[in-house]
């Protein structure tokens, strides 16, 4: 075979079909609220901002580590560094085709996680090896293996467009989210796409998102999965818009903050007036 260059950039991957046979966009999301075109027509000022972020690993001190012990009664006990022992238990049962009641997962003292230990890696392997050998099996990743085989957060390309009136009321907000998922579909795009403008009271919103596969490790959660990357683009645009109309960025945010019962995409919004005590 002939080695080819990997497709690691989210924007490059969107335009190619080399990772998967059909296309590299695994999922497309579009969420609407109100009339986005009318909202921008009513705006006196419009700001657009584009940002790119790189994949970032959670950087926990303790690597993934598991001990599995298969007993003659057909049960398996797994001691592991995890943030989700019930999920791990269910996945081990599914992969090993065992009854859920035959598996016990004991979460050990966690040496850091930040979302990165929500995913199953070593546990089914240790459990299967223990079942085959009929002896306890311990597996620990090296730091190199952690970086190569576990999931970082998505690399992203995010675009935000926001318009407001002269008195500082946001009339429309639009965002495009392009999130790397790694070699397999399934990034934190859905959470990011449904919460991108959740902090604000905006009548006209359009959010378009793409889950893009590329030649990287499958991504995992990392501290408010998906939110920081799009927040970087949106909040930068908010700052620029506030400066453009001569309003303090904090006052601008408070003026447009979500209130009790504010309607937003898919979910009822948080109340900034209550949360901030204003």
Tell where the protein language model's regions lie, with residue ranges:
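Structural alpha/beta core scaffold segments of enzyme domains
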Residues: 8, 14-269
